[in-house]
Amino acid sequence: MADSSERAAFREVLPKQGLLFTEQTPIPVLCKPKIMPMKSVTLEKLETMQREAQEAVKRQEEEQKLQGGMI
């Protein structure tokens, strides 16, 4: 008997007119991982500048050797 009286006390009431609100909890959304470059853009620029400078020095040394050998 106690169960039937408790059920009657907690009767569900749904409105026939008006707004019905529901509570939603945020769910984490998994995104695709972002691929990071192995080297930064500035590091690549520095490496290319260094390579170009080394090549320029080698060219100058070769030109000096050729001119020194001719004289």
Curated annotation (Swiss-Prot):
It comes from the Eukaryota. Disulfide bonds: none annotated. InterPro entries: BBIP10. GO terms for biological process: cilium assembly; receptor localization to non-motile cilium. Keywords: Cell projection, Cilium, Cytoplasm. GO terms for cellular component: BBSome; cytoplasm. It is found in: Cell projection, Cilium; Cytoplasm. Required for primary cilia assembly. Belongs to the BBIP10 family. This is BBSome-interacting protein 1. It comes from Nematostella vectensis. The lineage of its organism: Eukaryota, Metazoa, Cnidaria, Anthozoa, Hexacorallia.
